[in-house]
């Protein structure tokens, strides 16, 4: 009994189909099997200095938290007069408001329909409301131990940093939650200050540094990048200097943290990008890019 001749597989063109019998073994892999494979077709090529520039948003927010804590410590120790902080804060807010309006060119005001008089009324209402409730804020947490207040403040400030909008499109980002956590931390810390006036000024300062300051920074970053870099450096040096007056070890550790985020992390991101292999091919899930809203009405 003679064996039947085996068909020469070199003369038969291999096809990537499952519904047709082909004269190839089950473990046969053709050279054209992965011809449609594509790697990193949607990968973004990062530049080092561009990543360093974007990391400044994180630096700004860390410095904001540091400055807030330093100012609170100075007021708690009686080294900073509340009237001086209030006057400086109001003057800085006025300068920032004018600067924001000059950079924006009035475009945001035209879109929202908000006038300067309306902005002034909103500011007066907030100041009056906060001042009226400052005795309540001062006595709000009297029944809570100081250690618990400090722990809650640390937790809330960490949550503020985690949920802050750094420009990433992620589900964890929540500007409202981030701001509320920062204000809650400021209320907790303000309740441990000597007088109601201190609590009022501390909460007002928290609104300025956690709500108004990031808005100005985003506008500077979008319109005047060079000025934004200069302001970021000045703000970082101010935060480190303020912390240095309290704790030299803390200032060194904070400076190392800022350097790591602004220099080392972008460097490692660029290096790790060399090892990225994201494959694409006909096996990918189909993406419907057509607008189907007309079928839902």
UniProtKB/Swiss-Prot annotation:
The keyword Transmembrane applies. Pfam families: GPI2. It is a multi-pass membrane protein. One of its GO terms (molecular function) is catalytic activity. The chain crosses the membrane at residues 51-71, 80-100, 117-137, 153-173, 174-194, 196-216, 227-244, 250-270. Keywords: Disease variant, Endoplasmic reticulum, GPI-anchor biosynthesis, Intellectual disability, Membrane, Transmembrane, Transmembrane helix. The keyword Membrane applies. It comes from the Eukaryota. GO terms for cellular component: endoplasmic reticulum membrane; glycosylphosphatidylinositol-N-acetylglucosaminyltransferase (GPI-GnT) complex. One of its GO terms (biological process) is GPI anchor biosynthetic process. Pathway: Glycolipid biosynthesis; glycosylphosphatidylinositol-anchor biosynthesis. It is found in: Endoplasmic reticulum membrane. Part of the glycosylphosphatidylinositol-N-acetylglucosaminyltransferase (GPI-GnT) complex that catalyzes the transfer of N-acetylglucosamine from UDP-N-acetylglucosamine to phosphatidylinositol and participates in the first step of GPI biosynthesis. PANTHER family: PHOSPHATIDYLINOSITOL GLYCAN, CLASS C, PHOSPHATIDYLINOSITOL N-ACETYLGLUCOSAMINYLTRANSFERASE SUBUNIT C. Belongs to the PIGC family. Component of the glycosylphosphatidylinositol-N-acetylglucosaminyltransferase (GPI-GnT) complex composed at least by PIGA, PIGC, PIGH, PIGP, PIGQ, PIGY and DPM2. Interacts with PIGQ. Interacts with the heterodimer PIGA:PIGH. It is linked to Glycosylphosphatidylinositol biosynthesis defect 16: An autosomal recessive disorder characterized by delayed psychomotor development, intellectual disability, and seizures. This is Phosphatidylinositol N-acetylglucosaminyltransferase subunit C.
């Amino acid at each position: 009994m003679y064996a039947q001749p085996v068909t020469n597989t070199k003369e038969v063109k291999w096809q990537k189909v499952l519904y047709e019998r082909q004269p190839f073994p089950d473990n046969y892999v053709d050279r054209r099997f992965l011809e449609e494979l594509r790697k990193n077709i949607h990968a973004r090529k990062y530049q080092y200095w561009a990543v360093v520039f974007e990391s400044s948003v994180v630096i700004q927010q860390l410095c904001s938290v540091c400055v807030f804590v330093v100012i609170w410590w100075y007021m708690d120790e009686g080294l900073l007069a509340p009237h001086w902080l209030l006057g400086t804060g109001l003057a800085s807010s006025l300068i920032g408001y004018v600067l924001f309006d000059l950079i924006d060119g009035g475009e945001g005001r035209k879109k929202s329909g908000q006038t300067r008089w309306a902005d002034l009324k909103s500011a007066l209402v907030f100041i009056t409301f906060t001042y009226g409730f400052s005795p309540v804020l001062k006595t709000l947490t009297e029944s809570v131990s100081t250690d618990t207040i400090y722990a809650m403040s640390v937790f809330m400030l960490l949550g503020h940093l985690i949920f802050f909008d750094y420009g990433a499109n992620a589900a964890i980002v929540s500007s409202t939650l981030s701001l509320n956590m920062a204000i809650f931390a400021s209320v907790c810390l303000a309740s441990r200050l000597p007088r109601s006036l201190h609590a009022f000024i501390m909460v007002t300062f928290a609104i300025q540094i956690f709500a108004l300051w990031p808005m100005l920074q985003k506008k500077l970053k979008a319109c005047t990048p060079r000025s934004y870099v200069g302001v970021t450096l000045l703000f970082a040096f101010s935060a480190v200097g303020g912390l240095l007056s309290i704790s030299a070890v803390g200032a060194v550790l904070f400076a190392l943290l800022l350097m790591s985020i602004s220099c080392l992390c972008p460097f490692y991101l660029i290096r790790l990008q060399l090892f990225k292999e994201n494959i694409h091919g006909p096996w990918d899930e189909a993406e419907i890019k057509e607008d189907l809203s007309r079928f839902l009405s």
